[in-house]
Amino acid sequence: MTTINESPQWNELSVVLTSAPDSPAATATIEALRARVAAVPGADALVGGPTAIALDTDRGAAHDRRIVFPLVLLVVLAVLGLLLRSLIAPVLLTATVVVSFAASFGLSALIFRYVLGFAGTDQGVPLYAFIFLVALGVDYNIFLMSRAREEAQRHGLAEGTRRSLALTGTVITSAGVVLAATFGVLALLPIVIMTEVGISVALGILLDTLVVRSILVPALSLDIGRWMWWPAPLGKSPPEPMPSDLKRPLATPPAGR
């Protein structure tokens, strides 16, 4: 069915496609129409409609991801490098954040498709989930690895890693669980994109907190050893006295004969 609306300034040609608006065939039709219109000399026309809007949204989201993802990772690498004074540790920690995002988004896609019955994932969800997970993952990385460096200088690499995990594990795990529950509440909203963002971020935080930060990062740190902190030397200073040692009374010397 074709409808033509004319005015002195413009003409509108309305066409109903035989394919479903969200089908690949409809997308191919829109692309073909745009190519035909662009090939006409002096033509000044636009191809719109639901399929065209969805196509432009997808392309815009993909363009944003190609710019934002590398830019965010470069900024994170620079910040971690300045804080940790290392080249290897920031690369490793940034890689674990990317792994957390990829795993959580893959798991979320399965939930959206086979549990919730969604037709697909909104194009804005990957960008939102990536920004949230990178920001939160970097915070936990800084907490853990800053303490790991301090403890390694006092007690050696293996013992320092164990102590840093024991000292920061409760805080990181508690914060991660609370934050995951907060984002999980978004899944109760009757808005698909909010549901998808909430589930993706909540799963990512739980994976990052319970698996990556608690198991993967300490294990990789022990495997890499002192190269983790290259090129800064990881010197070992004597352990600082504990508060219990400071409060312990000094032994009185034996009385002289």
What spans do the regions from the language model cover?
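Structured non-transmembrane domains adjacent to transmembrane bundles in polytopic membrane proteins
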Residues: 1-89, 93-114, 120, 256
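Hydrophobic alpha-helical segments of membrane proteins
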Residues: 69, 73, 102-110, 140-144, ...
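Hydrophobic transmembrane alpha-helices
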Residues: 77-80, 98, 117-141, 181-184, ...
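Hydrophobic, glycine/alanine-rich multi-pass transmembrane helices and their short helix-loop junctions
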Residues: 79-80, 169-226, 230
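Membrane-water interface of transmembrane alpha-helices in multipass transporters/channels
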Residues: 85-95, 114-130, 188-204, 216
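Helix-loop junctions at the membrane interface of multi-pass solute transporters
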Residues: 143-155
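Helix-loop junctions and hydrophobic alpha-helical segments within the transmembrane domains
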Residues: 152-173
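Interfacial helix-loop-helix hairpins and adjacent transmembrane helices
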Residues: 214-257
